[in-house]
């Protein structure tokens, strides 16, 4: 059951009064030129509100906010907005937090959401969830990481990667939106290898059905398979045929190989959801890759 008290997104622009974001309001477009799909904003938690502003404010951080071109909220017509049930139209915009755990050998953890979940079932994402009242972003992210995977991380270096405007269903062709979030992607860096972290995994099968560690080369292939590109779902260069994942079967993790094509799949325009990496996760992976040292140039070798 949803908490009666939720941390909601509030907006201010050009020193206007702070107002709660409306469910049908395209937030990214509010801060970008010509209703575009990315914007540089300032954000932070303030008295159980997640504030987004075009200007710096105390304890805020500058960060990129982005949405997909096919964002349902962006493309919602006035008629469709009016057709939303009152409890949806008046629920505001929730705040989510997702944690990319980076091992010391430069791999990141993704989890596959359980098929039984109502939102984004069977989709690969970083561990995460809602921010509870009174929590800071990192505190919420580490709590969700612990609850979903069993990993307990404390005192780890971290940074905010970026914000993603998310809606579910992810495409208007799949139905009118019932959820609208601003997802905060955090990067936390462990001093352990992915093998050491893997041994500590104890996923909650109510939320997680599998785990995978991605290296930088696989992440690059996944990022290249954009969800709204004409050639999406096809490898953009050398890619392995399969990826080793850990599936949760009868309470225990079991190793198996999944086709690389699964991780390059995109959201179907109609019909049942398919196993895939979420569009927001691809965005987070692209931001993660940008944090890594660039390989030295070979031009003069």
UniProtKB/Swiss-Prot annotation:
Pfam families: NUDIX. Acts as a decapping enzyme capable of hydrolyzing monomethylated capped RNAs (in vitro). Hydrolyzes monomethylated capped RNA after alpha and beta phosphates to form N(7)-methyl-GDP. Shows low activity towards unmethylated capped RNA. The keyword Cell membrane does not apply. Its cofactor is Mg(2+); Mn(2+). InterPro entries: NAD-cap_RNA_hydrolase_NudC, Nudix_hydrolase, NUDIX_hydrolase-like_dom_sf, NUDIX_hydrolase_dom, Nudt17_dom. A motif (Nudix box) lies at residues 129-150. This is m7GpppN-mRNA hydrolase NUDT17. GO terms for molecular function: hydrolase activity; metal ion binding. Gene3D superfamilies: Nucleoside Triphosphate Pyrophosphohydrolase (3.90.79.10). It is an enzyme of class 3 (hydrolase).
């Amino acid at each position: 059951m949803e908490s009666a008290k939720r941390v909601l997104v509030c907006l201010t622009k050009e020193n206007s009064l702070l107002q709660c974001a409306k469910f049908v309001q395209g937030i990214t477009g509010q801060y970008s030129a010509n209703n575009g799909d990315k914007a540089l904003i300032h954000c932070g938690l303030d008295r159980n509100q997640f504030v987004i502003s075009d200007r710096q404010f105390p304890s805020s951080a500058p960060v990129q906010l982005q949405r997909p071109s096919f964002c349902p909220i962006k493309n919602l017509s006035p008629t469709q907005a009016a057709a939303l049930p009152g409890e949806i139209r008046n629920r505001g915009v929730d705040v989510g937090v997702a944690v990319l755990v980076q091992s010391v050998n430069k791999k990141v953890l993704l989890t596959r959401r359980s098929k039984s979940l109502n939102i984004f079932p069977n989709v690969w994402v970083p561990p995460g969830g809602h921010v509870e009242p009174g929590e800071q972003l990192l505190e919420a992210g580490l709590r969700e990481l612990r609850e979903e995977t069993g990993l307990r991380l404390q005192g780890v270096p971290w940074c905010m990667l970026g914000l993603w405007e998310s809606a579910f269903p992810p495409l208007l062709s799949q139905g009118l939106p019932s959820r609208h979030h601003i997802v905060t992607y955090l990067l936390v860096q462990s001093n352990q290898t992915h093998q050491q972290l893997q041994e500590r995994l104890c996923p909650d099968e109510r939320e997680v059905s599998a785990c995978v560690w991605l290296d930088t080369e696989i992440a690059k292939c996944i990022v290249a398979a954009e969800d709204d590109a004409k050639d999406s779902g096809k490898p953009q260069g050398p890619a392995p045929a399969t990826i080793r994942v850990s599936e949760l079967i009868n309470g225990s993790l079991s190793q198996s190989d999944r086709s690389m094509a699964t991780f390059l799949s995109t959201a179907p325009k109609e019909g049942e959801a398919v196993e895939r990496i979420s569009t927001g996760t691809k965005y987070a992976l692209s931001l993660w890759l940008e944090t890594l040292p660039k390989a030295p140039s070979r031009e003069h070798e």
